[in-house]
Amino acid sequence: MPRLRVPALIVVRTTWILVSIVLMVAAGVAWATYQDLNEGVRRSRAIAPDAPRSTGAVNILVMGLTTRLDLNGEPLPDAVLSQLQAGESDRGGYNANTLMLLHIPNDGSQASALSIPRDNFVELHGVPGEPIKGKIKEAYGRAKIAEESRLRSQGARSPRELEYLGREAGRRAQIETVRAFLDVPIDHMAEVSLAGFYYLAGALGGVEVCVNNATQDTYSGSNLVAGKQTLNASQALAFVRQRHGLKNGDLDRTRRQQAFIASVMHKIRAQGSSALPGLVDVAKQNVVVDEGIELFDFALRMSNLTGGRMAFQTLPIEHTETVDGESINIVDTHKVRRVVAEIVDPPARKQQKPPAPVPAAPAEAQPPPPPTADSIPCVD
């Protein structure tokens, strides 16, 4: 009986699918769960196909928005808003209050999460009159407003379409601004809403944190005792939002955000695959990723992170100033780029002349040592 000849391409595809299933089972990820996430999560075209790319390693820009609206621009339910303790739905704007660059090497070595202080005074790109100076967090909102104004002048658009196109302009501007500031490629992006932090903590049944001192803050609603404690969803959001009453203000808040992520990863690791369905539901409603990201490949890369192989670092600032009544961070762009280059491209850096020493930040601007993702760190 003649042997059936299967086209090589089909063999390759079939083999890849089988290998994928085996790997995902080994990683504790159900194929149905992956399919649900891959088909349900929102996608963005903010990163152009011809944009600069990393070689081998991957850089992912994570943006956390302040908006109190959902992905369609609709107000969140009143019950959720009251739990957020973040004011009415028209507050918050579209600032990217959380900016973090995830660098995942392709050799299995330690990954890094670089927090970019939101008030860094830098050149904004992708906004009217660019490049103009402003807080790095503002690129998203400025571009969104300008694009919606331009579209309205061209004719009627539905509110949902305006929201989508405005946000796409905001994402492009924020990515371009961070790319220019750090001088590294941005391969992928992930955007998380304010409510996303709340729903994430809820899906995990609370998040354990540790604070060095008891804190109470009426602005964020944070009310914590000293030491380790498990926070519900509302308390967890207050924990990552608080900056008033903290010695280093925004820098301490940045460290809290890092500690929150480390704790979330610690709990996901502990819960295993049982946590996945709830997390997928949260992602589908509160997360936007770029079209080019392959979630299966990303999940495999991220398996290193949930194993504790991730270090957090906050990029340096020089000092703070007050301009027009607002506090801004003055930064040395060349110094920041040297710090980033040492993490993102160490082999290339070693072949060049040694970089100049990076002066320490002022004492009042220096946070404690950064957390790692294999424990629950104590923070201020």
List PLM regions with ranges.
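Non-catalytic, solvent-exposed segments at the cell envelope interface
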Residues: 2-380
